[in-house]
Design a protein with these regions (language model features):
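Repetitive, compositionally biased segments used for assembly/scaffolding
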Residues: 93-214
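Long terminal segments
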Residues: 1-94, 176-285
Length: 285
């Protein structure tokens, strides 16, 4: 089995690079991982799987744009939140519960909801016309940001206090929070009432209820996933500063091929990952 670990992140954070439809992309979405996956997809004898480490609520839309919609994948954040849905679902902002009397104002870019004459919410849409973000307001200041999954539910919410981000919750399909990330120091709390995450064979309890960072949580869940793969399986890893340590410490006992993409990784920093590169089967530049 071949596993492709992409680097489809927004800058240097554990979130996809999906953006509002009217925003100009400064960089192409295409990279070497997309090329590799499309090539292997044409070879029916080569079994493969995409391994998503970051929070990717609109991955189905992204994969459709890149001609990879039928590619099998495993999502770390789906495992964490124990999300079972796999298919896209049509979600309209009309499906959301709004206060009685809310008025929608349509601009060329987004939709603003007014309540009692005040800005109540702003709906943002992705490149495929699906709602991706709804910002909520109180007394003219943002108080909440909801991220909508292309499978038809809210999968994360950010809470603001006095206009400043306080924490971010990653949600299960029933909107109950699973992880809470503190904005001040990046520490993570696991909901003690729901301390499990999904594995290939069932579910497992988190080792702790609090972590210093998301990196620790991702590494723990990823480690279980890798342990369930075969020793002869190969991981194609797109080199990215965000996930090199998280990955490198977990897949040392597997065959690894590291791939570089000029626009993504600064070669002058290669000395910091030499230890991981030395243990690889091949390096593709």
């Amino acid at each position: 089995m071949l596993y492709f670990v992409p680097a489809w992140y927004k800058e240097n954070s554990w979130i996809e690079n999906e953006q509002q439809w009217y925003m100009r992309r400064m960089k192409s979405e295409f990279d070497e991982t997309i090329k590799q996956i499309t090539l292997f997809h044409r070879n029916v004898d080569a079994k493969y799987r995409i391994v998503l480490l970051g929070y990717s609520p609109n991955f189905r839309h992204f994969s459709h744009r890149q001609g990879m919609y039928r590619s099998p994948y495993w999502s770390c954040f789906d495992a964490i939140a124990q999300i079972k849905r796999t298919k896209m679902a049509v979600l309209s902002y009309h499906d959301i519960k709004w206060p009685e009397g809310v008025e929608f104002v349509y601009s060329p870019f987004s939709i603003v909801a007014l309540y009692n004459g005040q800005k109540y919410a702003q709906v943002e849409f992705g490149e495929d016309g699906n709602p991706i973000i709804i910002d909520m307001y109180e007394e003219g200041q943002i108080c909440r940001r909801n991220y909508y999954d292309d499978r038809g539910f809210v999968s994360s919410t950010i809470i603001y206090e006095n206009g400043q981000m306080k924490y971010q919750d990653y949600l299960m399909e029933n909107t109950i929070w699973k992880l809470r990330v503190n904005a001040s120091d990046g520490s993570v709390m696991v909901n003690p009432s729901y301390p499990m995450y999904d594995t290939k064979t069932g579910e497992k309890q988190f080792c702790k209820l609090s972590y210093d960072s998301l990196d620790e949580v991702i590494q723990e869940v990823l480690s279980d996933f890798v342990n369930e793969t075969g020793v002869k399986d190969t991981f194609f890893v797109a080199v990215h500063s965000l996930h090199m340590k998280v990955l490198g410490d977990v897949i040392r006992e597997r065959k690894v091929v590291y791939t570089f993409f000029e626009e993504r990784y600064d070669y002058s920093k290669i000395h910091s990952i030499k230890g991981y590169l030395k243990s690889s089967e091949y390096i593709i530049t």
